[in-house]
Curated annotation (Swiss-Prot):
Family matches, as SUPFAM superfamilies: Scorpion toxin-like (SSF57095)
Official protein name in the record: Potassium channel toxin alpha-KTx 9.9
Molecular function GO terms recorded: ion channel inhibitor activity; potassium channel regulator activity; toxin activity
Main location: secreted
Species: Buthus israelis (Israeli scorpion)
Function (record text): Potassium channel inhibitor.
Residue ranges annotated as propeptide in the record: 22-30
Annotated coiled-coil segments of the chain: none
Lineage: Eukaryota, Metazoa, Ecdysozoa, Arthropoda, Chelicerata
Length: 58
């Protein structure tokens, strides 16, 4: 019985990791103004900030 509980825990952790990976995808990610230049670096971008949301303007 103990193994199934451990298995469930592992599944939950994996699911959380997948969710975090999806959420932290750059397309979805809302980057603050101060991180905007770093976030857009190397993308031939002109970073602008609108309503606290970073936009790379690639």
């Amino acid at each position: 019985k103990k193994t199934s509980r451990l298995f469930t825990l592992v599944l939950i952790v994996l699911a959380m990791n997948v969710m975090m990976a999806i959420i932290s995808d750059p397309v979805v990610e809302a980057v603050g103004c101060e991180e905007c230049p770093m976030h857009c670096k190397g993308k031939m971008a002109k970073p602008t900030c609108y309503d606290g949301v970073c936009n790379c303007n690639v």
